[in-house]
């Protein structure tokens, strides 16, 4: 039979499971949004190659989406890579460093599970590789080597841009999987704990109602 102390412990465990589930759910939502932004940025990169008349617009759109993922103050496409390297080094020395923003920063500030930080860090590092590929594409275009730029952009051969994009999305997918698995586990554990608590909580509620009704009776007897 459960004591009040054990019921309190069970309720505290249930509250902790709710907190873990909320953290995992928030991460799944944020990282799924990050994946959509990354694919959209990749589409802007392709449009940049296919539509010479609107290249400036697509370049700015790519930068804006890159900033949503890993943001830094005052950067341009020309300075993004160096600033990413600088701020990432600062983060590695101090995880509380606040020189970067964006979806990846939010995930790094919401680390809960074993392996989650390492997986997120690998995602940021893969993002950096993909960003450097983008700069190579634009440099080739600037030199008039558009065919070579297109080949580098769309090829899945090792070392080419799409291969790096695939590795980037795989790394991001692993972080999503970690959080999704823990979310499911927390929900199942929480449901099990709640199932155990519910009969006892109902019993305590009935007892409280009974005491509320019966408690005033002795004093009222004086007025009969």
Where are these regions (language model features)?
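N-terminal membrane-entry
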Residues: 189-207
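Interfacial "cap-and-anchor" motif at the non-cytosolic start of specific transmembrane alpha-helices
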Residues: 4-15, 21, 25, 29
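Juxtamembrane interface at the cytosolic side of transmembrane helices
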Residues: 1-13, 202-224
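Juxtamembrane amphipathic/hinge helix adjacent to a transmembrane helix
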Residues: 165-190
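Individual transmembrane alpha-helices with interfacial aromatic-anchor signatures
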Residues: 26, 153-161, 194-198
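Heptad-repeat coiled-coil alpha-helices
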Residues: 47-50, 54, 143, 177, ...
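Polar/charged, Q/E/K-enriched amphipathic alpha-helical segments with strong coiled-coil propensity
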Residues: 101-169, 187
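Membrane-proximal N-terminal soluble sensing/regulatory segments of transmembrane proteins
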Residues: 20-122, 148-153
């Amino acid at each position: 039979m459960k004591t009040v102390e054990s019921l309190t412990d069970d309720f505290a465990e249930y509250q902790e499971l709710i907190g873990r589930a909320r953290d995992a759910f928030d991460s799944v939502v944020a990282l799924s949004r990050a994946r959509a932004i990354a694919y959209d940025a990749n589409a802007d990169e392709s449009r940049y190659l296919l539509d010479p008349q609107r290249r400036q617009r697509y370049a700015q759109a790519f930068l804006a989406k890159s900033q949503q993922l890993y943001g830094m103050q005052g950067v341009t496409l020309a300075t993004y890579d160096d600033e990413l390297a600088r701020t990432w080094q600062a983060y590695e020395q101090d995880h509380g460093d606040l020189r970067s923003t964006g979806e990846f920063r939010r995930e790094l500030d919401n680390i809960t599970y074993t392996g989650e930080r390492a997986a997120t860090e690998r995602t940021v590092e893969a993002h950096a590789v993909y960003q450097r590929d983008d700069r190579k594409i634009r440099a080739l275009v600037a030199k008039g080597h558009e065919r070579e730029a297109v080949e580098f952009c769309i090829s899945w051969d090792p070392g080419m841009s799409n291969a790096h994009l695939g590795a980037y999305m795989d790394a991001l997918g692993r972080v999503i999987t970690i959080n999704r698995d823990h979310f499911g586990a927390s929900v199942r554990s929480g449901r099990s704990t709640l199932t155990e608590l519910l009969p006892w909580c109902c019993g305590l509620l009935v007892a409280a109602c009974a005491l509320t009704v019966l408690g005033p009776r002795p004093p009222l007897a004086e007025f009969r």
